[in-house]
Curated annotation (Swiss-Prot):
Organism whose genome encodes this protein: Arabidopsis thaliana
Protein name as it appears in the record: Zinc finger CCCH domain-containing protein 65
Coiled coil: 314-342
Low complexity biased stretches: 490-504
Enzyme Commission numbers on file: 3.1.-.-
Disulfide bonds: none
Gene3D superfamilies the UniProt entry points to: 2.30.30.1190, Zinc finger, CCCH-type (4.10.1000.10)
Amino acid sequence: MESSVAPFPHRRTHLPNRNYRSLLYHFCSSFDREPQISLATPAVLQELVLRTEIAQESPGETCEPPENLSITESKLNGVSGDSSGEKVETISQEKSLMLGDICDGIDLQDASVVSRHTDFFDSFELMINETQDSVPESCVNLFEALDVNDYDIVQNVLEKPNIATQVQVDPVESEKKAEEVPKSVESNEVISSGVLEACNGTVQREMELEKPVDNSPVLVDSVSRIVGGDDVEEGEISGDDNDDMLVEDDETVERHEEYQVSQDGTGNSHLTSHKSFGVEVMNVDNQAKKIDQTFSNEAKMDPGTSIKKRSAPSKDAKARKRAKARIKRAQERIALGVKKLKLKPVAPKPKPIKYCRHYLKGRCHEGDKCKFSHDTIPETKCSPCCYFATQSCMKGDDCPFDHDLSKYPCNNFITKGFCYRGDSCLFSHKGTPQSASDTPSANVTVSSTKITAASFSPQKTKKQSVRDAIAKLPAIQARVSSSVAFLKPSSHSNQRNSSDASSSKINEHVTPPQVPPLRKPSVAPKGMSFLSLDKTSQEDTVKASSASKPNTDNSDSQTLKQSQQGSFLPLGPPKGISFLSFASEEQKTLNREPQKPASSKNLKTTPSSHIQSSLLSAMKLAAEFESAKVERGNNDPTEAVNKSNVTVDTAVTRNSGNISSKILEFLSSFSHGKN
């Protein structure tokens, strides 16, 4: 029957099997012996059939395997049925063993009670064997009232005889009589197998009840949700989960039985209805599990969300918060007018490239490991490689020397005039060879001259510097002579001659450069204005000497006046040279002899005082010239007439000597002041 009704509520397990069977026996004993009315379950009926057979064989003893079956089979079959007899014996032995195991747990009292109802059980067995397809209506009503598990057992018992009828039968007519015995044996075997399955099911239930209960939270939640709306029954403890555990055990047993029914593969409508009922139960269970999973997932998600709210912000949240703060700060600064200072990026200074000094000399052994740069041409690249000339250079392009030897002349060809290598020589033979006479001597002379030049070069430089200094002396002398010309213009030519003679003595081998004649300044230079007095007096003396011949008296008077004027000292120091004390020095010179001035002793003869020495020599020559002139005048008769002229000349010479001594004293003091 197909069940369109909701699944049955879970119920508790039956009472122990022994009490249940005893109640059924007492209940069945009250009915008549009509075979059509029976209220016993199919499993109980099968057990009763087995017990009646055992009670008939040995009512007061334990169950023993029946031996009459094997004996009757041997009598019927005879010699030709030995093989089938052996099969029947084995089947009967197995049956006796199984029945013995079952009968061990049955009381003798139950067996005696069963013996009273032998007729009832016989009629029931005939009903099963004769009408396998048809079942009485009373039994059908009873099956519907019973549990589903017992109904399944009955269906299995009804179907298995069909399998048992497929026993192979020999076509021999002698074996037809023996077919009835195996059928009866097989029917008994089917009944015993059904009983065994029922007993095994009960044992499994009892063992599952004894197992520890899994206190998983999901199971408790699911049971509590299914039975959550019900109130607590009387006598039931709140929170007692034993009933729920029993319900779960029943569900496992039902699923196991459904699996067995699916393996049988029968097409009965009752089985299909049972399968649909089991599928609905499974669907309900699956829905309950899904609901439990959703509730558990929600329970798991709820604490997680609360933890996230309470926990610290993540890195992304912190980054977003910082970005918002920066944007807000930038807007505030823009509103206030604050601008960021923009600085030009400073370019890094380029590193100076340091070349390897060993590589420049062509002898770096570090190679690629060298810390300094090799990106340059070594200095040895301008010299030929001697190893390449002999074709033994192993460096190739990395050689620091030049391998293009055609740029360099061949030494053998230039010096000797020939090369023993001939055309195989890598050097150039384009140069003209030297003569044999020139080559050895010329090389020696050239080398000797180079050595001497190198050795005497410092001496030459010193001599050259001295010569240059001497060449500059005439210019200095010309300046001094020009200054002296202001003092003594009459003896200008004599002084020039004397200076030329002295310079010729000093520079005997040196030809002085030609100095252009210096013009006389119209105005005395600054600082030398005191010489203007002497100049005017000297000019007057020159005029007087020119006009002395016609007017001797006037000339004498003029010369005396000039000498007196020249002997007088200036009242004050000249303008511009007030730092010199001429008065004390001039008084000393007047007290001394004019022939031997004291300043001449202090003059130095070193090369630095060439000017002073030249002036001294010029003065000496002038004095000698004047003395010689006087002597000539004394010896000459023409000049002896005019004695007055002689006296005047002597006075003039004396005055000139005094003037020269004064000039020397002035120049010496001036030179000492500079030093």
